[in-house]
Amino acid sequence: MEKLGEDFFTKPTLMLAELLLGKIFVHNTGDGRCYRGKIVETEAYLAEGDEACHAYRGMTKRNRPMYGSPGTLYVYFSYGCHHLMNIVTEPAGVAGAVLIRAMEPIEGLEDMKRNRGLERTVDLLNGPGKLTRAMEITLSHNGASLSGDTVFIEKREDTAPHKICSSKRIGITKSTGLLWRRYVSDSFFVSGKKAGKAC
């Protein structure tokens, strides 16, 4: 199975937030299980001019992966209860990342349901903390490269046409006016209200 390489992720963060929609994220757990989900919602974060970005005030031990190679995972623990998964963008040394907010489940549904304690497929991955729990993404994946065999994005075209919309990001208190959330308008698997405008 071909994977997207580093050249795909070395793009402006806002562009990548849109290009990732429809792409398939894969997590091979190493014990024979595989999780696959189609990305349907993202948010962009940039160090320059974005107070909601973890790297707004510069590099720290926590946000160091954001300055690394594009196509690296930046996973952090939020409010002591959720892991959130971001994909590092921009050239190395420039802090930017795309938060994966929601996916459509494709493979590993029974394990996802067990991990979440839910039966409704539509609710399994419709939130950034929900999808990491369902797909077993933890701090152990922080700094992992998407060019390996454990976590990666499939290199294939999404043949199903979809309308992409933008809106304000969800759950932040700074730089709230930026329309840096992207989502597939007709997806039932997005995390928040489908309020926004077409891109």
UniProtKB/Swiss-Prot annotation:
Keywords: DNA damage, DNA repair, Hydrolase. HAMAP family: 3MGH. InterPro entries: Formyl_transferase-like_C_sf, MPG, MPG_sf. This is Putative 3-methyladenine DNA glycosylase. It is an enzyme of class 3 (hydrolase). Belongs to the DNA glycosylase MPG family. The keyword Flavoprotein does not apply. Gene3D superfamilies: Methylpurine-DNA glycosylase (MPG). The lineage of its organism: Bacteria, Pseudomonadati, Chlorobiota, Chlorobiia, Chlorobiales. It comes from Chlorobium phaeobacteroides (strain BS1). It comes from the Bacteria. Coiled coil: none annotated. Its EC number is 3.2.2.-.
